[in-house]
From Swiss-Prot:
Coiled coil: none
Organism, scientific name: Escherichia coli (strain UTI89 / UPEC)
InterPro entries assigned to the protein according to its UniProt record, in alphabetical order: PurM-like_C_dom, PurM-like_C_sf, PurM-like_N, PurM-like_N_sf, PurM_cligase
One GO term (biological process): 'de novo' IMP biosynthetic process
The protein's name: Phosphoribosylformylglycinamidine cyclo-ligase
SUPFAM superfamilies the UniProt entry points to: PurM C-terminal domain-like, PurM N-terminal domain-like
GO CC annotation, single: cytosol
UniProt gene name: purM
Keyword terms of this UniProt record: ATP-binding, Cytoplasm, Ligase, Nucleotide-binding, Purine biosynthesis
Amino acid sequence: MTDKTSLSYKDAGVDIDAGNALVGRIKGVVKKTRRPEVMGGLGGFGALCALPQKYREPVLVSGTDGVGTKLRLAMDLKRHDTIGIDLVAMCVNDLVVQGAEPLFFLDYYATGKLDVNTASAVISGIAEGCLQSGCSLVGGETAEMPGMYHGEDYDVAGFCVGVVEKSEIIDGSKVSDGDVLIALGSSGPHSNGYSLVRKILEVSGCDPQTTELDGKPLADHLLAPTRIYVKSVLELIEKVDVHAIAHLTGGGFWENIPRVLPDNTQAVIDESSWQWPEVFNWLQTAGNVERHEMYRTFNCGVGMIIALPAPEVDKALALLNANGENAWKIGIIKTSDSEQRVVIE
């Protein structure tokens, strides 16, 4: 009989002990996100969550997203602590535009070789994003897949479920001629346009860690976590008649605003109402990017746009700014049968 080496899962590149160590490391931060509706803890086959009792006719709203190639930049710069906030933001901001309160969040973390410190930093960021948005991190999947990813490269995806009263769903159907558009300032490029960002860095030969912009490294501007608008917007919805909300993500102004406009309406954006944050001026100049392409790729300093009746504007601005948002009037809605749904002038 020929002697053969006894193989283990670890020999194949999967370290179960590292996975267990990660769970032990993150339990504390995950527990801080717990809502009263959540039943059980980490480790079950499925997460249980009751619906909040305040809803008479609750409708569940779900969303899933990633952070695109911003993740590649974060890995290249070895900055993993805020990418989890980005992941949560991309999901919960999509939910709140429909009036939904985020309830719970799950994440998927996949890597070729699990580094407990890196994964812990990412998941701690996810927990922070959940705290900022008031939802519970109820579970996730950490997949160590040798041969699928290069070295310690990783990818993340997020999944969120929220709830809204059926009669209070915001779907844009109430938008009408004369409505005013309010902008909520962004924290930077958020999590969109990073393939172009990375191309600009490559072509310009710029090192984002040594290049200074507004007194801090360019890397700080590019990796600033996506702003989470949930709590401010939910309070606004309670107190103001909001007709529509657009989350400015991939596709920028041209593609996201029309998603919430009824037929025969047009959004007219006043370009003079705000100054682009310096990072967008740098990207446009360094990449020689045309204005139309900037508005199609980046948020250019505007993370959300809210449509509401003109008499509600002052109240809405006061509420939003009191909650720490940078909010201003950015445009109006007018009746139009033009195929151009958004005009920036």
